[in-house]
């Protein structure tokens, strides 16, 4: 069957009449690569199937949650069983207790956990808690890092904000944004200088331990340790945003992988197993400040939803199987190193980063990418061309040069081989 996008084009045209930009999250609109977004009809294992009948090997994984692959039987069974008992109660359930206990067991630095509905809710609530606990207003974040779309975090943000060229969003009052101080990721000197000026006013640092919203940028040695030391020195809290890296870089997330102890952690994506779930947690003395035990208010009609908790519990049980993360890391290494080798064979400069089950590639001749300013200098036009060539080959990558890629347990050796063979053909067309 010839490759066609006719039905996706029809749906995108219709969607733009009813939905702003035709999508419900900006990066899905393909603004970063041009063309028509593929409308997906179903997903299974490592594959997406669009409304035109095209099959794609998927390296987006619903932007991170699908660590085990799409439509995993254990998660699907748990959801179907939970649905039999009702969709939502607005009251406490056993499943949310079990979920919190399992998170604590896996990530012991999260002594108490509050469930929410998204990663944005988790980061927004954690920052409010940090401000309430410390009695300070200012926060520190990093240019190009993305922590959701709360007002205080849309200052020099990453992810779709970078894709759209709007790192400072209209609608965020200047009086509000002034409390957000922005530093350079992987540059401790910029953090130290900021604290030297505002240390007594800073409530927290919030950081992606692996920056996954300006592509994939792991921390340089000593960076996370330095943030911990600075927070300790000035009495600020360290919030590690593990919405993307949690249970993906390792079972204990990036904090376990790099051996860093945060004061607060935010989670999302994988903990919902594909359902909308977020969480934040940390030291008991800090979490005690959250209502109803403390004065910092946070609430949610659907928080701890029983169907979502069932999916999350099934996911967290499944990912604890021995050897799973070694397998994922090896699959990721094969894809990342394979892309690099395929590009080199065609004389195309490509730098690749990867850690755990996430990876990123950059069209640049710089041998190492560790900072946002380097990402911004990469060849975006080359990425766009490569993206569309790969899409026609049946490989679905994130439609933005600023987003990381994700492996799942469902990706087979054959899938990886097919991906790399496709990449070599695409690179050959780009010479």
From Swiss-Prot:
Coiled coil: none annotated. Its cofactor is pyridoxal 5'-phosphate. GO terms for cellular component: cytoplasm. Pathway: Porphyrin-containing compound metabolism; protoporphyrin-IX biosynthesis; 5-aminolevulinate from L-glutamyl-tRNA(Glu): step 2/2. GO terms for molecular function: glutamate-1-semialdehyde 2,1-aminomutase activity; pyridoxal phosphate binding; transaminase activity. Belongs to the class-III pyridoxal-phosphate-dependent aminotransferase family. HemL subfamily. This is Glutamate-1-semialdehyde 2,1-aminomutase. It comes from Tolumonas auensis (strain DSM 9187 / NBRC 110442 / TA 4).
